[in-house]
């Protein structure tokens, strides 16, 4: 049962559409959406597209959804000042029923997969969708923020960069970002299980999909293209 893990889409519908074509090519038969569908330039359209998937799908919540939900409910989003306009705009685009949908998403998801074992999906860490760690975070720090788990693999996102870490017997894999990657351009995602597009037998594999310049005007028409620019600059 190959599973596509799609993280950090951030309202980038053209990137999502490109990845969904790749998901079909790879033969995935289930999708896990790992949080931060919003905020971004096309929040409603992106959410609707995910809800229209013909494959079985499950969501987990990210820090982006939590910030937008806080704004929708009149609370402080806790977002840095440079992102607050984007959070407000996204909150204004979503219908209350869509907010209720986001609020129902769990923080973690567990799945047993042949060839991998127990897989724990979370946005950043199981305890906190805002936790930040990278490929160079010390092992002791990583162990402390992930906490106790009987999982064989933790799949996460949040930092928008793919990496693979082994901590004792636990593998931690960052799925990368569909809609706002740090690093080379493209739309990044993770396939768990066999990949029907290649002959090699794999238990998991990163995938990257390029998409052309014709999609750029679709994003530029949104006032929230500034959000994408600011988020990219944060890493500089």
What are these regions (language model features)?
Residues 1-3, 111-120, 167-171:
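Beta-strand-turn-beta hairpins that frame and shape the catalytic cleft
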Residues 2-99, 103:
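Core catalytic region of metal-dependent phosphoesterases/phosphodiesterases
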Residues 10-15, 39-41, 64-69, 153-166, ...:
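Active-site environment of divalent metal-dependent phosphoester hydrolases
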Residues 23-27, 53, 113-115, 147-150, ...:
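Glycine-rich phosphate-binding loop signature in dinucleotide/nucleotide-binding domains
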Residues 32, 58-60, 122, 155, ...:
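Hydrophobic/aromatic beta-strand patches that form the interior of the parallel beta-sheet core
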Residues 77-81, 115-148:
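Active-site-proximal segments of metal-dependent phosphoesterases and phosphodiesterases across multiple
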Residues 136-173, 178:
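Anionic-ligand binding region
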Residues 153, 165-236:
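Acidic, His/Gly-rich catalytic cores of divalent-metal-dependent hydrolytic chemistry
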């Amino acid at each position: 049962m190959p599973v596509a893990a799609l993280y950090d889409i951030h309202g980038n519908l053209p990137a999502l559409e490109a990845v969904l074509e790749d998901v079909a090519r790879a033969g995935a038969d289930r999708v896990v959406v790992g949080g931060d569908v919003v905020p971004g330039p096309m929040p409603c359209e992106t959410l609707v597209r995910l809800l229209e998937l013909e494959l079985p799908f499950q969501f987990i919540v990210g820090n982006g959804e939590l910030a937008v939900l806080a704004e929708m409910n009149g609370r402080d989003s806790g977002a840095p000042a440079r992102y607050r306009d984007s959070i407000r705009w996204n909150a204004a685009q979503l219908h209350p029923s869509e907010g209720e949908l986001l609020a129902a998403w769990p923080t973690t998801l567990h799945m047993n997969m042949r060839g991998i074992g127990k897989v724990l999906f979370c946005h950043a860490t199981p305890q906190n969708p805002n936790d930040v760690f990278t490929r160079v975070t010390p092992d002791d720090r990583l162990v402390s923020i992930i906490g106790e788990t009987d999982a064989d693999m933790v799949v996460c996102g949040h930092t928008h960069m793919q990496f693979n870490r082994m901590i004792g017997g636990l593998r931690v894999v960052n799925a990368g970002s569909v809609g706002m990657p740090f690093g080379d351009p493209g739309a990044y995602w993770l396939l768990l299980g066999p990949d029907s597009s290649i002959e090699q037998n794999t238990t998991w594999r990163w995938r990257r999909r390029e998409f052309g310049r014709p999609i750029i005007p679709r994003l530029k028409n949104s006032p929230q293209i500034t959000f994408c620019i600011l988020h990219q600059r944060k890493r500089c």
